[in-house]
Amino acid sequence: MDLNQRKEKKGQHVGCCGSRTDLSADTVELIERMDRLAENQATASMSIVALPSSFQESNSSDRCRKYCSSDEDSDTCIHGSANASTNATTNSSTNATTTASINVRTSATTTASINVRTSATTTESTNSNTNATTTESTNSSTNATTTASINVRTSATTTESTNSNTSATTTESTDSNTSATTTESTDSNTSATTTASTNSSTNATTTASTNSSTNATTTESTNASAKEDANKDGNAEDNRFHPVTDINKESYKRKGSQMVLLERKKLKAQFPNTSENMNVLQFLGFRSDEIKHLFLYGIDIYFCPEGVFTQYGLCKGCQKMFELCVCWAGQKVSYRRMAWEALAVERMLRNDEEYKEYLEDIEPYHGDPVGYLKFFSVKRGEIYSQIQRNYAWYLAITRRRETISVLDSTRGKQGSQVFRMSGRQIKELYYKVWSNLRESKTEVLQYFLNWDEKKCREEWEAKDDTVFVEALEKVGVFQRLRSMTSAGLQGPQYVKLQFSRHHRQLRSRYELSLGMHLRDQLALGVTPSKVPHWTAFLSMLIGLFYNKTFRQKLEYLLEQISEVWLLPHWVDLANVEVLAADNTRVPLYMLMVAVHKELDSDDVPDGRFDIILLCRDSSREVGE
């Protein structure tokens, strides 16, 4: 077709198949001239850059298969291919110049030309569907370059390519929307370099290829959504958050040991009598005769609630790690023992609600008896004075043996028939209550706790203390006691262990008094009956101690006594003697049982005794 005919084709488009429409005649003429010039230049350069066909075939097939996959979207990389020459030819939709030509949508440089969809090298041209190079051919889904091909939206460098999800460089990584070349040529949609051409979906590098979900670099690749830190140890996270520090362990241990020794000396100076059998009352400054009656027998580690001074796997004496133990040789009284005794002293001064709040206040010291002792010792003088005030009446009764007379209690005489009863009547009532309990096989502790007449035959048939306690545990007495009363503020074994090794002195005194009970029964003219043995007797006192209704009534009627909040003090108080209305001496626990019976509305309507019936039955056998 001559030039005039081409001009007449004005307005035709140059499409991907070679047709030229929508272009002016001048443009068509210019294109034709450029085509001829390109053909001449290509012919001249063939002798310079053309490679043997065998070498090309080897590069384009064997080596490609060796390093790459044949999948439609796979990457193709060539190690042994030649670089593109200074001149490049393009197909019918590509512009090429000696130095550079620019198509409407394509950039071509001295070292490379790129079609919008096609890469072509010096020795081959690529049509709209296929790329062919001297060393590689690439279709619309495949890139072929001398050294690397990169996705349209991917960065490529001489030594690295990165796809849309991957950053990979030898020395640096670029993001998925940036083109980087050796020499910097950039098209609006395509990046082309001397060493890189871009296909629409594939990345290829000299030493590594990266698909849309794979990281590949010559030495390292970095994913765009991942953090990679490299260091000499290969673990940057550990080094950043746990820096390696060169610590002189021997020096550290020596310093720690010196601190422990210093703390040990301070504690020994603060509590100097721990080498003897010291208790917390001595530490507070009480005299020995006062300590005898305020002594906290029956108080041990089980007095403490669960979790208070009861951590396992630590030193039993100070509750510290063995490396930090502050106990010293020859120490007979541990700091933990003094701490639980100090806790018992605080219980002496508080009712149930106040003590519960106190336990919450000292929560930071629940695992630190040494720290609690320091806290306790700060108010040492204040605690001593408070005990002297609150327990003056108790020491007067138990230590000086001051007599309690029911007639001195105005509220008692006005509010209870028991306070107008003679000593004989009180004793008869006491024996009668026990006789009824024995006959009905009633559970003693539960009865005195809330007047509940549950049956427990095993308790009455027990031959020794162990069987007796097992019977109580079997019927759930201790569990109910903890759930219903302030016994829950102590350890779960506290009440149970009161029947074992505690109260030995009081037990001896009680068993010696059994002969007195026999003489009393003979003097009353009744057939002697069995009096309760020690375990049943202690069950009665424990039930009365945790019976809040009874306690409040007794303390209101008997004006000479006040509140006691420790079981040992209650048991000791119950064994003092009082003067009945006829000035006869009776143990206080007998008066307690009489008041308890009076409060039992089922047997004593309106809380009053029928004195006439009681006297009428005085000659009748009491007990078995």
Swiss-Prot record:
Region ranges (Disordered): 113-249
Domain of life per record: Eukaryota
Biased composition (Low complexity): 118-225
A cellular component term, taken from the record's GO annotations: cytoplasm
Comp. bias (Basic and acidic residues): 226-249
PANTHER family according to UniProt: FANCONI ANEMIA GROUP M PROTEIN (PTHR14074:SF39), HELICASE WITH DEATH DOMAIN-RELATED (PTHR14074)
Protein name from the UniProt record: Putative uncharacterized protein YHR219W
